[in-house]
């Protein structure tokens, strides 16, 4: 008998976008903890409902057993995949493992000093030292979907649906 194992490296935003995974692993979303702001805006609620509706359309079941909180401190001891709406809770911002590329409307890109392809063969400080730093700002709406491994459980994922304004939330719901 031949058994096949199926593995996927998480977090993978493609499988989230296409199938709602890892949240859709349990069709009723019983392994999901949604973290929302204390006073969510209409756009944040629309983003949440759009995300849950999309996952439900993949599983064929409504999200009847998910947990929801507006207290970011409650996520530390939960054995659940986290879905963050609106902003990253401060309890996650302090984690050194999380490399967030989006902070409000700014992000940065590093370009190494080394300009040839041998960095993987002969790694040195030039391969890691930035030659330039580019700040990216926007006066228009911004939205981001980011994913990372949960800092509380290496078998769990976090997906954050972030927007800086009501128009940013529209970008998320129309994506």
Labelled PLM ranges:
Residues 1-175:
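Solvent-exposed alpha-helical segments and adjacent loops
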């Amino acid at each position: 008998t031949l058994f096949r194992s199926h593995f996927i490296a998480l977090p993978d935003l493609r499988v989230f976008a296409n199938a709602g995974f890892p949240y859709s692993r349990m069709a009723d979303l019983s392994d999901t903890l949604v973290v929302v702001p204390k006073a969510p805006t209409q756009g944040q609620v629309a983003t949440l409902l759009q995300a849950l509706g999309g996952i439900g359309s993949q599983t064929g079941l409504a999200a009847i057993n998910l947990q929801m909180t507006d207290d970011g401190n409650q996520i530390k001891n939960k054995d659940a995949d986290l879905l963050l709406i609106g902003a990253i809770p401060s309890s996650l911002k302090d984690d050194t493992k999380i490399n967030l590329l989006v902070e409000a409307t700014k992000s940065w890109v590093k370009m190494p000093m080394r300009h040839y392809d041998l960095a993987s063969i002969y790694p040195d400080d030039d391969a890691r030292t930035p030659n330039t730093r580019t700040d990216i700002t926007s006066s228009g709406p911004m939205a981001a979907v980011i994913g990372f491994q949960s800092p509380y459980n290496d078998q769990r994922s976090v997906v954050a649906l972030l927007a800086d304004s009501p128009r940013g939330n529209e970008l998320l719901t129309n994506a």
